[in-house]
Curated annotation (Swiss-Prot):
GO terms under cellular component: COPI vesicle coat; cytosol; Golgi membrane; nucleus
Gene from which this protein is expressed: ret3
Biological classification of the source: Eukaryota, Fungi, Dikarya, Ascomycota, Taphrinomycotina
A biological process from GO: intracellular protein transport
Subunit structure: Oligomeric complex that consists of at least the alpha, beta, beta', gamma, delta, epsilon and zeta subunits.
This protein's name: Probable coatomer subunit zeta
Family from the record: Belongs to the adaptor complexes small subunit family.
Record keywords: Cytoplasm, Cytoplasmic vesicle, ER-Golgi transport, Golgi apparatus, Membrane, Protein transport, Transport
Gene3D superfamilies membership: 3.30.450.60
Length: 190
């Protein structure tokens, strides 16, 4: 039984031919090299990925064991999302983490992520994964919160006001605009 918070050994996104789009491996600080899913080299990581892809390419299973690890996968368009954990991990928790990353990406991109979209928005992909998993610890599983942390805030005050108006009704918006204009007239900046 795993009593630590370190649930994730790796998060992978491979394309339909098994090539890397995104990979991130996590090494819990209390384990030594070679223990508990920690790979010693990129060559070992790629060998693991190739074998995993070959085993899962034609399967419809979402959860499986491979190389002594629990693997949860999700196929989306032309990419496959994998999350790898130890055999003692809760597969429902891992699946929820994987699904939340996929859903956060859908919220950000406004449609289902495919290979091209992921590569074009690689910076947002990296931030989504980092906001969800930190050193193998699952931090957040609510897609809307993850996406909100990734999106950029308003750049200027005018954009902030427009953003606020979208959230308010017409009368509230009118009142807010009236207050802002009055405030600027009194300051002499209008």
């Amino acid at each position: 039984m795993n009593l630590t918070l370190y649930a994730v050994n790796a998060f992978l996104i491979l394309d339909s031919s098994g090539k890397r789009i995104f990979t991130k491996y996590y090494a819990p600080p209390h384990l030594k090299e070679g223990e508990g899913g920690v790979f010693n080299s990129v060559k070992e990581e790629k060998t693991f990925e190739k074998g995993l892809f070959e085993k899962t390419w034609k399967t419809q299973n979402d959860i499986l064991t491979y190389d002594g690890k629990l693997v949860v996968m999700l196929t989306v368009m032309d990419v496959i999302f994998y999350i790898v954990g130890g055999m003692e991990e809760n597969e429902v928790m891992l699946y929820e983490c994987l699904r939340s990353i996929r859903d956060a990406l859908e919220l950000l991109f406004k449609y289902v992520p495919d290979k091209r979209t992921l590569l074009e928005n690689y910076d947002q992909l990296v931030i989504v994964v980092d906001e969800t998993i930190d050193d193998g610890v699952i931090l957040e599983t609510e897609p809307a919160l993850i996406a909100a942390r990734v999106t950029k805030g308003p750049v200027s005050e005018a954009q902030a006001i427009v953003s606020d108006f979208k959230e308010m009704g017409f009368m509230n918006s009118f009142q807010k605009a009236r207050e802002k204009i009055t405030e600027r007239i009194l300051k002499g900046t209008f």
